[in-house]
């Protein structure tokens, strides 16, 4: 059976271009080996802490179990799952495309990326639709139970989307680089462009179109409502700033990656590009991946830390936990002091008992 080997980038969906193009040039390899692992490590640390804090705060607060928070927690969980795979990819890049973690880890890390690509953008889209309904149609029914059902459906779709990754991703020796890479090995050449175009459409174009539509209508609704303009100007400014941030962050983080993978799919379908274009795509792919992955670290700040509700809940949680921690600390200090006094008394008592009664030798 004919097979098509994807070896240009472990996380992208490109094939190696023409032999005349030095796709993995020494310059590209050096900056990938040195800079990409640093970016991945930074994204992992920032995103892991941020998403863990989001999950802890919202799960601890039973009073704020809303539709929006349901999607926020699931979004944070999706980002957190993917971020757990970033250290593996960082090591992979630092070792020059040499995968040392085995076949199972290769498949699982690839699957976590695929899950995040779809789950993350679907949860962001659901949040956009929920905000649209809350502002434009405030009397419409929005239940937490319904949001949980939608979240389960999103997770199922995201997991199902990993079937091609689990089937085709595997370790494969690359003799020209003298490494064992974690790559996609397709049954034939049509699999790669078809899966890439599906990812471009379902994972970017449609969600971005829905988000842009929702937020443009929210903006028009707020600006066209006299009561909001007269009494809630600050609220309008805050919402509009959030709208712009949401749309721009998603677009800027993932647009470059999807454009580059789209060009790769077109090339595989027979569209001819110059050698310089192929080299540019190969050089920019790791950078575009860093941008896309940074969305997982930005999300907690974008959706939570700039919002009043999250800050209020974080402060409330701190106020609830701080007295308990203080009490525990005081209790431990008291016990230690008591223990020290008792130990001192025991030592003094033992010394007195051992002294000769005449006070001398």
Locations of regions flagged by a protein language model:
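Intracellular effector-coupling site of seven-transmembrane GPCRs
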Residues: 182-189, 200-204, 220-259, 278-281
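Extracellular TM2-ECL1-early TM3 structural module of rhodopsin-like
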Residues: 32-37, 41, 65-126, 134-144
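First transmembrane helix
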Residues: 32-59, 212
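Intrinsically disordered regulatory tails of 7TM GPCRs
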Residues: 1-27, 175, 228-233, 237, ...
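Generic structural signal for small/hydrophobic residues in well-ordered secondary structure
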Residues: 51, 58, 108, 156, ...
